[in-house]
Regions:
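Basic- and hydrophobic-enriched, low-structure N-terminal and domain-boundary segments
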Residues: 1-150, 154-157, 201, 491, ...
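P-loop NTPase motor domains
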Residues: 5, 24-27, 138-430, 445, ...
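Short alpha-helical interface patches
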Residues: 47-48, 52-53, 62-116, 215-225, ...
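Conserved long hydrophobic alpha-helices within structured protein cores
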Residues: 113-119, 373-380, 474
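Generic preference for hydrophobic/aromatic residues in regular secondary structure cores
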Residues: 116-136, 146, 206, 383, ...
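Low-complexity, polar-biased intrinsically disordered regions enriched in Pro/Ser/Thr/Gly
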Residues: 126-131, 230-239, 261, 485-504
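Conserved ATP-driven motor cores of ASCE-family P-loop NTPases powering translocation/secretion/packaging/pilus
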Residues: 422-525
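Extended alpha-helical interface modules used as scaffolds for assembling large macromolecular complexes
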Residues: 509, 548-549
Length: 610
């Protein structure tokens, strides 16, 4: 009813007054002396004041007829003039771009500081993706662009972790962020997980095969493995990649569904390929793996592994040897002893990050990218695992929002189908934050899909840089043009001096590429979907309420002890001799870290000990 009142009644109230005016003019005409129109019209001047002296409209039918006809005629006049009116946009002839202000961002900010995603020093975005007003709903996907030294880690990534409102997955070049905030998160009750490709002796274990449950999982894993180990340069004949895929699927199918639990890891896959001897001159030669699959075929002739292996065996001896060489080259990193040990079992629990507050750090080298593909491999599994767990266990939404803070996203490989995942993870309480040095890096990895990925980022932040294509994209497509006034002056001298001054309108970018390239180091530009861009100061880490808990504020008190975390969780090696002592420990003596090691939180999961 309120909407109808606002739409139909309120706009027509002024015409009631117009009708009253015409009614009074009708009264004046009726009271005027004379018998015809001309004499009555001349006599209006003497009766107008008397007609308007009384506010009451009276009951004379003639007066009401004049009032109604006059009001309707006036309304029709306004209607037709508005339909035929020329369209003018004053001060917006060439564009209406402007900088955003406090009023623009206010509806998107949560009153509680800790319930926001920090964007700049003055702009924040609520973590609530389902606000009361649907028009204010924004996804939490984010893209940050800034050249080296522009403050992507210090001014944006680290403050996000100090908010401590979600589960976090952090790609941490050099491991500096973990040392900065690890102790703070631990004190806040977070379960800390670390995969350290810089120093495997200070890393938890990651076994990608621990998350493979179905044949579809095998295909997803193989695609991710091949995508991130294809090396640089132009891709060769796709035949060899497809042949490798057949062999990987067959071997993984055997390992997952037929192998012992302790053998379900990448080491077994590498060992099986190493043991697949092929003789070019003897097509009937059978190696150890051939005999394994021959026995499996007798037991389960229609199983997935057998079908894939039979297709692989269609190749000749020479072709099979080339396939094995290609597989061996691709899996060469998994022959390194440190990596074999780190992938022997799993501690990361990638599928449980949304079940409780967890902070998982992937520490990578910023100078050597040998092992960086493992991060993309883990991420490709993690997104699918979290979506499946949200749908199958938690009714579509994870209990704890999971934020993926992916620093140096260009140096850690490719996640297959990321353009599709980024569009659907929002509803499962997962958000992706990508940090690049320039837009071209994203396009180099994901090609045409880069636009789809960036299009699903409601928040984009430019922290500074001078790469030409990036600043041109920002100037022309992010910021747009504003209409400005230009004043020109002219003066001519001769026999008679003349002076002229003209004002005209023209369009100008809010910031030109050259202005973006010379933007002050403490400034940034934020683009939030549906709002004008914001030209603001970067968030000062020292101004955060929890800054005092960082290692930078107090290195002695707040430094994170990674060695202690890893040593307490260490599992003896397969051939390591250990002495076991039976002791009784009172419950009050157990620490939070002991409880993490024992995984008491998994006792209610029927699949935890299968």
């Amino acid at each position: 009813m309120t909407d109808k009142l606002r739409k139909y009644v309120l706009p027509n109230i002024p015409y009631v007054f117009i009708g009253w005016v015409f009614l009074k003019l009708g009264t004046a005409y009726r009271l005027a002396a004379g018998g015809d129109f001309a004499h009555k019209f001349i006599g209006l001047g003497q009766t107008v004041s008397a007609a308007f002296a009384d506010f009451a409209p009276g009951l004379a039918p003639f007066d009401w007829l004049v009032g109604i006809v006059g009001a309707v005629a006036f309304r029709l006049l306004i209607y037709f003039k508005s339909k035929n009116a020329k369209k003018y946009r004053r001060d917006a002839e060439y564009g209406s771009a402007r900088w955003g202000n406090e009023k623009d961002i206010k509806p998107f900010v949560d009153p509680k500081f800790e319930n926001n995603m920090l964007l700049t020093a003055t702009e924040r975005l609520t973590m609530n993706t389902r606000p009361k007003n649907p028009a204010n709903a924004r996804n939490l996907n984010f893209c940050g662009i800034g050249s080296s030294g522009s403050g992507k880690t210090r001014f944006w990534l680290t403050p996000q972790l100090l908010q401590a409102h979600s589960s976090y997955v952090v790609v941490d070049p050099k491991g500096g962020v973990l040392g900065q905030v690890g102790a703070f998160l631990q004190k806040r009750g977070y379960k800390i997980k670390v995969f350290n490709s810089i120093d495997f002796s200070k890393s938890m274990h990651y076994n990608p095969l621990a998350y493979i449950k179905t044949e579809a999982d095998i295909l997803k894993f193989v695609n991710a493995l091949i995508s991130n180990t294809k090396g640089e340069g132009k891709e060769g004949d796709p035949f060899w990649t497809k042949a490798e895929t057949l062999l990987y699927c067959a071997l993984l199918g055997y390992i997952i569904f037929e192998g012992a639990e302790e053998d379900r890891n990448m080491n077994t896959l590498v060992d099986m390929i190493s043991g697949m001897e092929v003789k070019e001159d003897d097509e009937d030669f059978l190696n150890a793996v051939d005999y394994m699959f021959k026995g499996l075929e007798q037991r389960k002739p229609n199983c997935f592994a057998v079908k894939q292996y039979k297709k692989y065996k269609l190749s000749s001896g020479k072709t099979a040897k080339s396939i094995l060489i290609s597989c061996g080259a691709r899996l060469a990193p998994f022959d390194i002893p440190q990596l074999r040990e780190i992938m022997s079992y799993d501690e990361l629990e990638l599928d449980r990050m949304g079940d409780r507050r967890t902070a998982t750090f992937f520490c990578i080298s910023d100078t050597d990218s040998t092992y960086n593909f493992l991060v993309a491999l883990a991420f490709s599994q993690m997104f699918n695992l979290l979506c499946e767990r949200a749908d199958n266990v938690h009714g579509g939404r994870l209990p704890h929002h999971v934020r993926v803070l992916w620093d140096e996203a260009a140096n850690t490989g490719q996640v297959p189908n990321l353009e599709k995942l980024v569009a659907v993870i929002r509803s499962r309480e997962i958000s992706l934050c990508l940090l690049y040095q320039q837009l071209a890096q994203c396009k180099a990895i994901y090609d045409k899909n880069a636009e789809t990925i960036l299009g699903n980022m409601d928040s984009v932040l430019f922290l500074g840089g001078r790469e030409a294509s990036t600043i041109k994209e920002i100037s022309e497509n992010w910021l747009g043009k504003a209409t400005i006034s230009m004043q020109t002056e002219g003066r001519s001298r001769g026999q008679s001096e003349s002076y002229s001054q003209n004002t005209q309108r023209l369009g100008r970018e809010l910031m030109t590429p050259s202005e973006l390239a010379t933007m002050p180091g403490d400034r940034c530009i934020l683009q939030l979907r549906g709002l004008p861009p914001f030209y603001s100061k970067k968030y000062d880490l020292k101004q955060h309420p929890n800054y005092r808990f960082t290692a930078e504020a107090d290195k002695v008190k707040n430094a994170f002890d990674l060695d202690r975390l890893i040593d307490r969780r260490r599992r003896p090696g397969m051939n390591e001799e250990c002495e076991v002592y039976e002791v009784s420990v009172p419950d009050e003596a157990l620490t939070d870290e002991d409880e993490d090691i024992l995984n008491y939180d998994d006792l209610d999961d029927p699949d935890a000990f299968v």
